């Protein structure tokens, strides 16, 4: 225990609880009209998951950005040897749900590689890097995105090349080869995590919903569909903000419940659909990837 007095902390309340109204001095300071204060699904991932426009209550979500937070919603915590082995957590979500998920490295790998090239005097936009990756040879080399060497700032392209050399794979040399290696490796790690979720939940989740800023990397979304062998739906980009708003609208009675909120979001924003391709090639490459990360 910290020894801090309990009275200095606020009450713990469920997401969607109306906590009160703005104090008069706060309204005056910020120039606001009278407004209710409503708790939302915290933190940012909690609100992002509220906004997932899933067609059913059986889905896998990926909140995609610098990190990829992957998981599913359950009615009760999943506490098993397998969940501990796979490093999954159970967090309280909106509407008495459990956010059963884990963090894996995300587009940090591409972001930091881009910064390294900029330090070396070469500037690229993300669409330019994606175009280079499209031109590179497919399914050639893989890394474990969660290897500790990739977790700190620095020369990630060099570290990626060293990893591939150490694991007796073709060494990516061009910018396109490096970015393609990153994106394909992330997609493979998604499949590894998806398979673990299926195992722990005792059923095959039919689809994957990707939300957040990482949905703008459409090549990764297609690779995720290819690797996981299931349909991928992407959007909205501003998932956290929309989930925050949705929780407030439910609390105010403007939207019926979580299911209706997701329907509203699905019908209000462009949701892109990616269908699996090249199944045999990706399945064969996945076997290579699994061997690699288990060594």
Predicted segments, located by residue:
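Active-site core segments that coordinate phosphate-bearing ligands/cofactors
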Residues: 1, 24-207, 216-240, 246-277, ...
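Divalent-metal (Mg2+/Mn2+/Ca2+)-assisted nucleotide/phosphate chemistry catalytic cores
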Residues: 1-6, 12-15, 21, 29
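Short Asp/Glu-rich motifs
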Residues: 18-19, 244
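General small-molecule cofactor/ligand-binding pocket signal
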Residues: 7-13, 38, 233
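Short linear loop/turn motifs
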Residues: 10-18, 127-132
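Small/polar loops that bind or transfer phosphate-bearing groups
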Residues: 14, 212, 236
């Amino acid at each position: 225990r910290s020894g801090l007095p309990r009275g200095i902390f606020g009450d713990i309340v469920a997401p969607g609880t109306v906590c009160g109204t703005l104090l008069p001095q706060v309204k005056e300071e910020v120039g606001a009209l009278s407004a209710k204060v409503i708790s939302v699904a915290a933190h940012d991932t909690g609100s992002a998951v509220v906004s997932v426009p899933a067609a059913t209550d059986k889905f896998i979500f990926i909140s995609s950005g610098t990190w990829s937070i992957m998981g599913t919603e359950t009615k009760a915590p999943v506490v098993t040897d397998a969940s501990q082995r796979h490093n999954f957590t159970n967090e309280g979500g909106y509407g008495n749900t459990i956010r059963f998920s884990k963090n894996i490295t995300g587009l940090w790998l591409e972001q930091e590689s881009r910064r390294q090239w900029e330090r070396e005097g070469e500037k690229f936009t993300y669409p330019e890097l994606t175009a280079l990756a499209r031109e590179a040879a497919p399914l050639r080399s893989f890394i474990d995105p969660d290897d500790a060497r990739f977790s700190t700032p620095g020369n990630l392209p060099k570290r990626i090349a060293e990893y591939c050399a150490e694991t007796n794979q073709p060494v990516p040399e061009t910018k396109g080869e490096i970015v393609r290696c990153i994106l394909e490796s992330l997609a493979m790690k998604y499949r590894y995590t998806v398979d673990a979720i299926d195992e722990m939940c005792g059923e095959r989740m039919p689809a994957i919903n990707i939300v957040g800023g990482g949905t703008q990397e459409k090549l990764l979304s297609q690779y995720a569909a290819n690797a996981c062998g299931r349909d991928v739906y992407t959007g909205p980009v501003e998932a956290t903000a929309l989930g925050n708003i949705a929780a407030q609208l439910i609390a105010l009675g403007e939207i019926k419940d979580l299911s209706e909120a997701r329907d509203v979001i699905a019908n209000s924003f462009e949701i892109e659909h990616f269908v699996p391709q090249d199944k045999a090639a990706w399945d064969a490459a996945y076997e290579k990837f699994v061997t690699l990360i288990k060594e």
